[in-house]
Curated annotation (Swiss-Prot):
Positions bearing Phosphoserine: 564, 567, 572
GO CC annotations, alphabetized: cytosolic ribosome; cytosolic small ribosomal subunit
WD repeats (start-end): 69-115, 186-224, 289-331, 374-419
Protein name: Eukaryotic translation initiation factor 2A
Biased composition (Low complexity): 493-507, 563-583
Amino acid sequence: MSSQFFLKTSQDIELFQSYPTFEQSNTNSKDFPVISSVLSPCGRFLALSTKENVKVFTGPCLDNVLLTMKLSDVYDLHFSPAGNYLSTWERASIQDPNHKNVKVWYLNKPFKKDCVSEDIVPAYEYQAKSQSGWFLQFSKLDNYGLRLFKHDLKIVKLSSANADNFDFQSPFAVLSDDETSQHFTTYLISPAEHPTICTFTPEKGGKPAQLIIWALSEGKITKKIASKTFFKADSCQLKWNPLGNAILCLAITDFDSSNKSYYGENTLYLLSFQGVNGTLGGNSVRVSLTTGPVHDFTWSPTSRQFGVIAGYMPATISFFDLRGNVVHSLPQQAKNTMLFSPSGHYILIAGFGNLQGSVEILDRLDKFKCVSKFDATNTSVCKWSPGGEFIMTATTSPRLRVDNGVKIWHVSGSLVFVKEFKELLKVDWRSPCNYKTLENKDEAFFENHIINNWEPLPDSTTSSLDPKISNKSELQIHSSVQEYISQHPSREASSNGNGSKAKAGGAYKPPHARRTGGGRIVPGVPPGAAKKTIPGLVPGMSANKDANTKNRRRRANKKSSETSPDSTPAPSAPASTNAPTNNKETSPEEKKIRSLLKKLRAIETLKERQAVGDKLEDTQVLKIQTEEKVLKDLEKLGWKDE
């Protein structure tokens, strides 16, 4: 079975098989627009909300309705890491101040077919008026649940036998910061089998910010595994590595004291430890980066390295080990996105957003060698396939309301599938389920979504999703690509895997150098027949003054010898001061050519600015897109690119 991906529009949700067929597996059309939709990280469920209800789908093609909940105005959905819990956020009621607008539903159990919410009750419900950070945090296997109560972080222990044990009044563990005037604002549980918790406390009243990793144990949590104190930190972003033994913290200030950045200053810190709950010690370092903003930072799936894109454009791209030492650096380039493939074999670096959309694929196992390049302009979503052989790029609304669609690329840089939409809202790959599920034994119940054994399946299950194609000629290109190229011929070069536009007619020359060494191209005159003229120079005269004098004498002598062969040659007459001048006016065609060449030079200047990462106005981007039309107009007027 190949990978699957889903596409959400304002009217329906479509599920597609990936390479090589790209067949549409299922379409869930609704009478009402879909407000929110999300795939579970485990790949077992698809949840979507409308104005009147919330539905959960399951099955190989996500076409079986597992559960229908009669909830109105659900604007956000969230799955736990293992997919056992679905959280729904409703708009808070104005009439009822005690309205519990967040409900947590347990899904890893049998459900009657055509089950509705009247038959079940949520495992937990509470009030969260803000839509920011409203959901509970869960550990990797959903065996711990976390919720922050003012200054206390309370943890409950969960299991399949006690799935609704959300008793935060008698929690399994408590992490409190009542003893200090500073209180942590951000926390994140690690994805390890024996999880730990990282907390961030911003600086306040002259006291430095704190970053601490805590060991999770029953009762009051007091053991610190690793910690780091620093200034210049109003907020932060936390990212654990997949093994859960190291975390990156991007500290952010609201203002840049040097006034070089509108978005504040960035500093990156690394905390790591060894052994269960840090029994072998911890370590904390500040990662040394180039001056400037941090555009992206991400962990390798191996958990042994991480990559950072930082600095003013063109940015510096570096890779580090768990000690914070530089392993490898790439030349500076206009890039702001980095993504490791699921196996860690390939690394994608790209320049999206206000950059030109160039993408490079590096081979981590071959000394970071560049495997392929391609252009994916206007990309708002970029993700690796679960098998690690294909890349999805998409343009979605409301980020961009034009050229909406999805493209699938092979790691070799070849475009293999395209689908365009008038309005595309969301795209995502469906993750494979890494655990064994039960089989249906009772026709009246759904049971094939239940996981009882939490031992992961072999890694070969994920890697077999995408075929390994070493020879590019064996790659099967979907018919949609040819249709796309025929409709957009100017974009053909961006889908050929080399990321460069090849022009017929020799090497590229900038507009100001295209006519160097050649005469003027005059409409209707063969190339090379037109000669250069100097304004104010007598036709037929040379620009060399001495040569003109000799030619005058030679013509006078020849004329006198022809009229009177026996007569003595008369002295040559002085040059006439009233020589005729070239008063011929410039033709309308030449004026038009000059105007078009001026536009071409301006377009070339804008393209050079765009190539180095400068942000262009919308009108300037539109002007670049008129280059092809300008060249066609010049060709019609007889101008040729030499």
